[in-house]
């Protein structure tokens, strides 16, 4: 894309374009490890039967040479209890988390495009200070594909004319990405659902 022509006898027509230029592209991982102690009115854990974990409300924000992360880890677990009256118990809980990933050349002004996916997740029971299996240890590893863009502005030459000599501009088509909307808004939704008995 021609962006300058410094001959006095040549007339040029220019067009100002704004587009996104990729500044930083980095892949990294974020580990979320936390513990949860089950309530005292629940029986001890004999064995874990089934569990699922979700990362909710993940907020990734670039700052100076670092990306800060915060969100909530939601866990649902079925476990076998040592209590014979109720051999199968269920438990659902959420744990807030925060962390950070190093990202050289990142700044707050850059426009982030960060994709996060769960790479690994595990849940295990461990004994508390009394030796009873009452602590659940969750371990989740997120894979982050981080791209940071900067909005750039260039004057492109769209036409050239001179009466002195013949000018044949050569050009080619390029695909440029442009920022349409930059949105920082958040929306909190709450509702009540009635369950028929």
Give a label for each model feature.
Residues 1-197:
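Viral structural modules
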